Amino acid sequence: MSFLQTPAWGKTKAGWTSQSLGWFVGDELVGAGLILLRKVPKVEKYLAYLPEGPDLNWANSSDVERALKALVVFAKDRGVFQIKMGPHTWVRRWQAETLKSVIALESAKVIGEVPPDEVNQSGIALLSQLKAMGWKQRKAEASGFGDYQPRYVFQIDLAGKTEEQIFEGFNQQWRRNIRKAEKEGVTVRQGTVSDLEIFHTCYLETAKRDHFTPRSLSYFQTMWKAMREETIERIALIIASHPDHDGAIAATTMTRVGNHSWYSYGASTTAARDLRPSNAVQ
C-alpha cells in the first residue's frame, strides 16, 4: 500500500476531507483505501480522489468490478461528480541498464518511447477492463506525470543487502561523490521536527533555482505531525550539514509503509553543491 493511502495523508491535505474505506466479503477485509473529497464552490458537489489507490486485488477482474461499482455507489451517495484514482500496479518495466543505454545513444526523448524489458499482462488486462467500465486514463505529460502523481517511478530493491553491497551497486561517479562529501567534512544525520525549519529554508532555495512552486512550512509540519502520530517510522527527515555553512546544505524527507520507502521531497543549496551533499544524503 502507498503512503498516499494511509489515514495520515488525509490529515495532511488542506482543503480536502478524507475517509478511510474498507471492502468486505462477509467479515473478511479484501480491500482498503483513502478517499479524499474536495467541495466545488457554491454547489453541493465533490471531486473524489484516491491517490495511488485503492488497495485492491487488481489482478482479479471480478473483484475489481465489484469493488469499483461499490465505490461509485458510495461516491454518488455523497454528491461526488467525478472520481480520480491511481491503481497501485504496473504495466511496463525498464531496467536501469536499458535506460542508461538510451540516454547515451539519445535514441528516445521520453521514457514511453523506450521498448520495455518486461510487460505485465495483468496490468494490460486491467487497463482494458477499466476502459470497458467507463474509466478514462489521462495522457501522461511530457514531464512524466499522469494528472497528480508521477506516471513512472524508479524502484531499487535493497532487501538482504549490506551497506557495502548497496554502495558497490552505485555507479563510479556516485561513489566518488559520496567519498568526496565525506572527505570534505559533510555529515548526515536524522532530523527531528525542529529541523523542519532549516529543511524548509533549503527547500525554498531549491524551488527558486529549479522554478517550481514550493510547499509552505506549515504543510511539512502538518505532514510530520500526522504521520508520526500514526507510527514513528512513517516519515523521516535526513539532513546534510557542513561546519562552513549554516543550516542544511541538503536534505530529504522519506516516507515509509512496511518495507517500502519513498523519496518524497529533496532540497539542496547552490553554495555547497561542490561538496556533493545531495549524494551523501541520498
Predicted regions and their residues:
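A conserved beta-strand-loop-helix scaffold within acyl/acetyltransferase catalytic domains
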Residues: 1-44, 87-92, 118, 135-274
